Amino acid sequence: PSHYYTINIQIMTPCIQIKRVYEAADPADGFRILVDRLWPRGIRKDALPYDLWPKDLTPSPALRRWFHEDPDGRWAEFSQRYRSELATAPSVNEVISRIRPYDTVTLLSAAKATDHNHALILRDFLTQRMG
């Protein structure tokens, strides 16, 4: 007799967390991505463990300067503009293919603000693109 099997394949997406670059690295961080365009102040290049630094996934210099003039007042529009930049960033698909095998991915940023920073938008963008 022939038997038919149904195989359910679920593609898992990594848990993407955000951490300040000044916090200690931890093996639980998984794949670590630096998401600031500029190297963080006060950190030696050999003192920050990271796996990837895709500068084109960071806000453009002009957008970053504009946002920093009024972070609270410009957050909503910054979010829209940054998402538009991400939609055309050349390395998006490469980054997604690099992080997909990991259970955990950590976005590293020097940003002090935890409620209004680009890493939040990038996390949501990557999660949606992988979903």
Tell me the role of every PLM-derived stretch.
Residues 1-11:
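N-terminal amphipathic/basic-hydrophobic helices that include classical n-h-c signal peptides
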Residues 9-131:
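Residues lining hydrophobic/aromatic ligand-binding pockets adjacent to catalytic sites
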